[in-house]
Each structure stands twice: as C-alpha cells, then as structure tokens.
C-alpha cells in the first residue's frame, strides 16, 4: 500500500498578495469583474502547480475562496439573506461581497452579515444566517468550475467541501427562534447534487470537512452525523476531515459513519495513532496530519516518522498537513533578510509540502537519512543563545500574587478617575487607529527601505498624529487617540520593539476577505529593551487638553496573533510579554498618560476547543492581563477592547480582568452581546460598539441612538461609553468623519434627553 501526500488546503492570497490587490481594485471600481476572476484562475493554477512540484500527490480543489470558505458554502447552498439578494434571484460574486462587506460594485448596500473567528484561529468567516422554513438549492457552482479547471490542467485532485453538520453548527438563527439542526434534511439534497456532479467528473475522493467533530457537541448534534452521512454515501469516496483537536472523545460517532477515510490532526490533538489504527474500520484510509499547518517551524521528521511508522503497511495511509496551510505563509525561499540560522528553523507552506514528500518517501522506502538531515537544525535551535535569556526566566519565576492586583477595587478607582477626567455622560472615544492612508503607508515604507532618514520620518509621523488630534477635536470626541500612524499592525509593531521576535518580508496570511496579516515569530525569551509607545503618546497629549489614550496590544493577543515557540508553553510566552508591557504601562503613566488601553481582542479565540480545558487557559490568560495592568495607579484608567466575542460563557474571566472600561464589538449582533453583561451584572464600565467598521457604510444618527437606547436597557447609562466596534485603520477618511460625526451627535442627543 503506497503512501500518498495531500494537503487540506493552500494559501489563496498569492505570494505578493495578488488576490488582495485584485479584490480591492474591483471593489473600488478600478478593474472589471472579468479581471478579478482572471486573477483567481491564475492564482489557483499557480498554487496547484507549486504543490505538485513540491511533492503533493492529491491537490486540494475548492479551498480557494473570494472572501472565506464558509461564505462560499452559503452561496453553494443558496443561503443568501434577503437584504443581499439580487432582484432577479440570481447569485453572483457581488452577492457574496454584499454579504461579507455590506456593499459591492452592483446592488444596494445592506448591513453586512456577522463575522467571527474560525474555531481558535486568527482566520475569520461570515456567519451563515438561518430562518425557519428556509429553502436551499444549488446556486453557486464555483467548486464544480474549479474542479473542471484543475482537471483540464491534468492534475490529480481531491475536491474540498465544508460538511453539512459543521456548516449548520457555525451559523445563527435570525428571526423566529427554532432549532437550526432541523434544516439538515433540507441542505442534504444540495450536497447530494454536488457529490453526483463530482462523480460524473470521475472524482474518486472528496475531502469533507467536519471540524465540529473535535468539539464537545450536544448529543443531538452528534446524533445528526449518521443520518447525514447515510444520505451522502455511495457516490464518491469520502475523507471525513477533522482538525485543530483530537477525535478520540467522539470516535464512537465517527466509526459508525459510512465514509471511506478519516483525517486526524496529530499536532493539536492527543489522539494515539495505535489506538486509532485499532479502532477504525480495517478498510478505512487514515490520513495522518503530521505537519503543522498553523505555524512556521520546520518539523522534526525523524519524530514524525517514528510516530506513524508502526502502522505502515497495515492499512491505507496518507500523510498530510494537520489542517489547511491557509494559516501558514506561502514560501520561505523568498525571505532574504532572515539570517541563515533563524531561516534554517522555519518551513512555510511550500516547504511543508516538501516535508510531506520527504516523509512519504521515507515511509515508503524505509530510508531515513534525508529525514535526519532535514531535522538537524531543530537540534541546534534547542541550544541557541537566541532562544534563552536568563534574566527573563528569573523575573518570570519571581512573579507573586501581588503583581496581578491593582491597589484598590474598581469602585475606589472610578471615583479617582471621575475626579481626574470630568467626562460627560455617554463619553465618546474611538478604539485606537485612524485611516492608514496611502501617504502614511508610503512614509513608513520609504523609511523602512532607507529612502527617508529618521528625522524626516519622525516629522511626517508627528504631522499625521497632529492631524488626527485636530480631526478628533473638530468632531467633538471626549477621549482621543493618537491614531497609530507609526504602526503597521497592532501586533507586529510591538514585536518589532521586543526582543525575542523576528519578522518576515512576505509572511502574509489571510485574516478575512482581503485583509492579510504578517504575524511576528516568537523565537526566544521576550523582553523590552526600551520604551515603545511613550514618545508618540506624550507628543499627542501635548497637543490637546483632552485625555489621550495610550494604546497597547495585550499579552494574550500578541501571543495568539504571532507564530509562537513550540519549546515552551503558551502561558510562559504570555507572561513574558505581560512583564515587558507592564514596564510600558509604568512609563506611560509617568509620562502623564492617564488612560491606557490594553487591547485583548484575542482572549476568547485562544480558548481551547473543548470546554473542559478552558479553566486552565483562562486562569493564566487573565493573570497575564492583570500582570500587565496592575502597576497602574488608581487614577489611571485602564481600558481593554475585545471583538468577535461571545462573552456569556466566560463572563467570570472578563470581570476578573478588572479593567475599568471594556469596549466590545456589538453592532453586527444588534447589541446581543450585552445580554451577557446584563445577566452577569457586570460592575465596571462598557463601551458597546455602535457601528461596524468592517463595512464602509455610514450609520445614521438615528441608528446609533437606537442601539445606545437598547444598550441602556441592559446597562446603566452612567456606565456606558460610545465608540465604534473596532479600530478605523482600514477605512477611508470621508466615511470615518461622517460616521464619527453621527456617533458624537447621537451621544449629544442622549445627553440632552436626560
């Protein structure tokens, strides 16, 4: 039985972010739809060929998406909210963009659908909306068209589909409440139709993703898998695909299904290969996810060989990435600025394909010399001076409970803060960043490339900060920000100023739609060699009598949005970052900054997928935040910001952060998130986001007032702040001014109505 290689998916955006540029050009009306579609075809063809040349035997098709793969599945099933539909009932790429962005080059603007994190990753998806009695039909044939493309190019392929049960699990009911699982019988005919079309094309295997099977699902949802897969069986071979955790707790459900193979994540799961081999039906193929799809580290292939070799020849076996390589940068070979030592520790998506090929060849032949050669740099890294810092390790070991306690409780601090700031009712602020204009990005790029000296760069940044302060004062905001003109990314910026991180030139990964991020890589112990944000915060405060917030990214978010080390725990990394940023809080306070925001948008996304593992994570995650913040005096107001969160199941931990003010993303969920704070009787101040910054649509004064009145039904008005959902870096100035003017006007109206 020859072992084959495959990947669960590949990065879509292109090495130079070609997809992002094509999307944004199309949205701006600068290119045609045909030109956009052509870029997609070119990228798919290139990526299939690259994977093939790197040694992948079965290429994934259907992993490409114009926004995200869950939204693609919604269109496949004809699940289009009424507000986004074309007048003639047809579905096209602009339909997709209206759902994701709220607008497109054609059709009427409408509120974008809700967006949230994909399991515990930094990738996002558009949440499917379900209504009672909803009808489904095959309306979007992107998958079939891409299968035809790949077959025409002569590739051996494996189409990829998001499974029906996971799709329903990921959605939300809109309108009259009902059990969305009852829609399963209605979407299965569409899946049957698609599988029949794939069978007609001679497809042997289909990868059907059911990552919900790694969760602690309610019994009714577990019970739904058997009838669903009974309905889908028989047309093609199905590779039931799971990732991000192990499957052992749900293995009884899985082995009862009429599928022909199972993919398991052997990186993030704790499944035992021998037990899986023993319990799976003897005729099933096992796809072993041995190469980490979510990081940038070179794999120890000798270890992977030992992990799987015992079952070679005993059942059909494929070797694969643990999950889609979507979460990894594309190609390490184009990184020219990493020094040789550090570069030897890494592997990006194409190199991971090469790792799979090396592993396949060794498992098929029994020859392991190539694996030992590949793995040698990993042994060297374990002893590198660039990894270990004795002073950091000593400080971490000396942390006490007192280091995570503010001097006094919130009630005492709030009095001191009210006396200091004298803010009006319904105080207005923004979350931190202002539009990153072409001029700002050009300024940073010229400085980075050496085309601009430090003095001219600093003069330019200072002018943009000054303009941001002027804009905010003109708008009438109460608490200002400096706008973050000097920051390329909220995590990358801090990583650049902390020891223990390295950066790539082209290590882009998709976050959502056209948004890409270039995560820093934690290669060693973390420390702060010098103040990071103090100079610009102090300058901004000197321009105004209103308070200006100091802006920090929190330790858990820096951890979650970086590629972490694998040789220490996530807790260790988070607390090292917290200690470094604790010094930053102290320095900001000493410089006269009275309000300091520590953003933790990733706190919830870092949760383990199984609820039984949550407590330990939340304990150290909360402690890291408190270590970061607790150095502040009573009269210093600590804010935190979170987005895409459902809080009801972690409210104890949110309260335990003990932030004086929390701002949250609520507009897309119509203030639903505040129910959690109301039920918990959250004691501190809250800024529910009153408009969606991910959409270019400008909210009306009436819309914002209505949301704030709804918020005041749940939270006492004296504890409410008024702010957008998130930072404004991706927006343009015209819509930013208009939206903030309406937001300030709404707050003024509510003050006058008291």
From Swiss-Prot:
Q: What class of enzyme is it?
A: transferase
Pathway where this protein functions? Amino-acid biosynthesis; L-methionine biosynthesis via de novo pathway; L-methionine from L-homocysteine (MetE route): step 1/1
GO BP annotations of the record are: methionine biosynthetic process; methylation
Q: Which positions in this protein are listed as binding L-homocysteine? A: 431-433, 484, 599
* Enzyme Commission number(s) of this protein: 2.1.1.14
Instruction: Provide the cofactor list for this protein.
Output: Zn(2+)
Record keywords, A-Z: Amino-acid biosynthesis, Metal-binding, Methionine biosynthesis, Methyltransferase, Repeat, Transferase, Zinc
Q: How is the cofactor bound?
A: Binds 1 zinc ion per subunit.
Q: What is a single Pfam family found in this protein's UniProt entry?
A: Meth_synt_2
Q: Which reaction(s) are listed as its catalytic activity? A: 5-methyltetrahydropteroyltri-L-glutamate + L-homocysteine = tetrahydropteroyltri-L-glutamate + L-methionine
The catalytic residues are 694
Which residues are L-methionine-binding? 431-433, 484, 599
> What role is this protein assigned?
Catalyzes the transfer of a methyl group from 5-methyltetrahydrofolate to homocysteine resulting in methionine formation.
The entry's family comment says: Belongs to the vitamin-B12 independent methionine synthase family.
Q: List the HAMAP family hit by this protein, alphabetically.
A: Meth_synth
The molecule here is called: 5-methyltetrahydropteroyltriglutamate--homocysteine methyltransferase
Organism of derivation: Salmonella typhimurium (strain LT2 / SGSC1412 / ATCC 700720)
């Amino acid at each position: 039985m020859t072992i084959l290689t495959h990947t669960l998916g590949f990065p879509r955006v292109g090495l130079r972010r070609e997809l992002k540029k094509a999307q944004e050009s199309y949205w701006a009306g600068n290119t045609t739809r045909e030109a956009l579609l052509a870029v997609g075809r070119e990228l798919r063809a290139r990526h299939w060929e690259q994977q093939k040349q790197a040694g992948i035997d079965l290429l994934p098709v259907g992993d490409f998406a114009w926004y995200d793969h869950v939204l693609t599945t919604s269109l496949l099933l004809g699940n289009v909210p009424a507000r986004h539909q074309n007048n003639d009932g047809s579905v096209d790429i602009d339909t997709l963009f209206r759902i994701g962005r709220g607008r497109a080059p054609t059709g009427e603007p409408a509120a974008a659908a809700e967006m949230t994190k994909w399991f515990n990753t930094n990738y996002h998806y558009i949440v499917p909306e379900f209504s009672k009695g909803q009808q489904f039909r095959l309306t979007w044939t992107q998958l079939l068209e891409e299968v035809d493309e790949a077959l025409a190019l002569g590739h051996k392929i494996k189409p990829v589909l998001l499974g029906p049960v996971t799709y329903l699990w990921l959605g939300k009911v809109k309108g009259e409440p009902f059990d969305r699982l009852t829609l399963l019988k209605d979407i299965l005919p569409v899946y049957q139709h698609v599988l029949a079309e794939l069978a007609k094309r001679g497809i042997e295997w289909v990868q059907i993703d059911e990552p919900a099977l790694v969760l602690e699902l309610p019994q009714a949802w577990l019970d739904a898998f058997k009838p669903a897969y009974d309905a889908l069986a028989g047309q093609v071979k199905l590779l039931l695909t799971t990732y991000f955790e192990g499957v052992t707790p749900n293995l009884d459900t899985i082995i009862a299904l009429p599928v022909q193979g199972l993919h398991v994540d052997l990186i993030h799961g704790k499944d035992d290969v021998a037990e899986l081999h023993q319990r799976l039906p003897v005729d099933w193929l096992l796809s072993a996810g041995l190469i980490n799809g979510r990081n940038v580290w070179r794999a120890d292939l000798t270890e992977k060989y030992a992990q799987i070799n015992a079952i070679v020849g005993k059942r059909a076996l494929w070797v694969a990435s643990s999950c889609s390589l979507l979460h990894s940068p594309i190609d390490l070979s184009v990184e020219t600025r990493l020094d040789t030592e550090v570069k030897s520790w890494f592997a990006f998506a194409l190199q991971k394909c090469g790792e799979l090929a090396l592993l396949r060849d060794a498992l098929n032949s029994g020859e392991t010399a190539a694996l030992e050669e590949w793995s040698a740099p990993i042994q060297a890294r374990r002893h590198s001076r660039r990894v270990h810092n004795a002073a950091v390790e000593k400080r971490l070991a000396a942390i006490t409970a007192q280091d995570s306690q503010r001097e006094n409780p919130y009630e005492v601090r709030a009095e001191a803060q009210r006396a200091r700031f004298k803010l009006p009712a319904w105080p207005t602020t923004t979350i931190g960043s202002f539009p990153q204009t072409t001029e700002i990005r050009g300024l940073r790029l010229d400085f980075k490339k050496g085309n601009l000296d430090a003095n001219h760069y600093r003069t330019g940044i200072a002018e943009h900060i000054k303009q941001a302060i002027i804009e905010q004062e003109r708008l009438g905001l109460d608490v200002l920000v400096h706008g973050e003109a000097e920051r390329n990314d909220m995590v990358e910026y801090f990583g650049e100023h902390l020891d223990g991180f390295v950066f790539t030139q082209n290590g882009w990964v998709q976050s959502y739609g056209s948004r890409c991020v270039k995560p820093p890589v934690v290669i060693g112990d973390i420390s702060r060699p010098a103040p990071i944000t103090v100079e610009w915060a102090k300058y901004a405060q000197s321009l105004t009598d209103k308070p200006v917030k100091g802006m920090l990214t929190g330790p858990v978010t820096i951890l979650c949005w970086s590629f972490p080390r694998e040789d220490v725990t996530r807790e260790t990394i988070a607390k090292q970052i917290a200690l470094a940023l604790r010094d930053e809080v102290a320095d900001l306070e000493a410089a006269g900054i009275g309000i300091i925001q520590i953003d933790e948008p990733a706190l919830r996304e870092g949760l383990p997928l199984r609820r039984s593992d949550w407590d330990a994570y939340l304990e150290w995650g909360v402690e890291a935040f408190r270590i970061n913040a607790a150095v502040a005096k009573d009269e210093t107001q600590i804010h935190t910001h979170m987005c895409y969160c459902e809080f009801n199941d972690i409210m104890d931990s949110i309260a335990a952060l003990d932030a004086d003010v929390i701002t949250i993303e609520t507009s897309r969920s119509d203030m639903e998130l505040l129910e959690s704070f109301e039920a918990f009787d959250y004691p501190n101040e809250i800024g529910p986001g009153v408009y969606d910054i991910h959409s270019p649509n400008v909210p009306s004064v009436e819309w914002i007032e209505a949301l704030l009145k709804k918020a005041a039904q749940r939270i006492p008005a004296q504890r409410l702040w008024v702010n957008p959902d998130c930072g404004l870096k991706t927006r343009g100035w015209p819509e930013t001014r208009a939206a903030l003017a309406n937001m300030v006007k709404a707050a003024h109206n509510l003050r006058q109505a008291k």
